[in-house]
Amino acid sequence: MILPQAIKPVVTHLSHQDRLLAFYKWVGIPLRSKATVLLVHGLGEHIGRYTHVAHYLQAAGYAVFGYDNHGHGMSSGEKGSLIADNQLVDDLRFVIEHVRRQTAGPLVLVGHSMGGLIAAEAAVQNKQGIDLLVMSSPALGADTNPVQKLLLFMLPSLLPNVRVDNGVRSQWLARDERVVKEYENDHLVHRKISVRLASWILRTGEKVVREAE
C-alpha cells in the first residue's frame, strides 16, 4: 500500500452550545470512499496526533475526520475539564451529525482510550448514525481501590472542577522513543484531569460494560 504524503489536516472550529470544537478534515478524501471514519482521541492528547492513522486509512479508500474533545487540543475549555456528565457524548453526537451532512455511506467510529469510552457510551445510548464501532484500549475499567472509588463518587459534588495530574506517563504510550519524544514535546498535550471528568470516566466505564452485556 502506498501511503499519501504527510499533509496536515484542514482545521476549523464548530460552535456547539457554549463551546468551540476543533474539527479536522484530512485533505485528499476519496470521492467515492468505502466508508467514513471519525476518530476520537484519548485523555490529555488531541486528534492531530492521529494524522498518520488518517493517511493510512485514506490510502485504503476511507474518508477521515476527527475533532478535539472539550478541554483538549485546540478546542475550548480548561484542560482536562468537564462541564456536565453527558457533555462529551453530546459533543460527539453533534460532530457525527456534522460529518453525516458532508458524506454518504457507512460511518465508522474509531476511539482510543477515553475516546473509546465516549464512542462506546454514544453507541449504548443510541446506535443511530453509527454503523461500526472500533475501540483501541478503551477506558472501560479503572485500576482503583475501594477508597479511591468512593472518593471519585463523592468528590464531584464537593470539588468538581479541581484538576490534578491525570496519571498518563509518556513511556507507556509506545516503545518507539521518537514517538515518546514527540508526545513529550507536543504543546497541545496536557496532563490534567478534573475530579468530575475522572469520576465520569470511572462511572461510565462500569455502565458501558454493564449495559453492553
Segments (PLM) and residue ranges:
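Serine-hydrolase catalytic core
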Residues: 171-213
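Short beta-strand element of the alpha/beta-hydrolase
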Residues: 33-42
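N-terminal cap/lid segment of alpha/beta-hydrolase-fold proteins
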Residues: 1-28
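Conserved alpha/beta-hydrolase
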Residues: 49, 54-78
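Catalytic nucleophile-loop/oxyanion-hole region of alpha/beta-hydrolase
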Residues: 44-46, 73-103
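Helix-rich cap/lid subdomain of alpha/beta-hydrolase
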Residues: 145-185
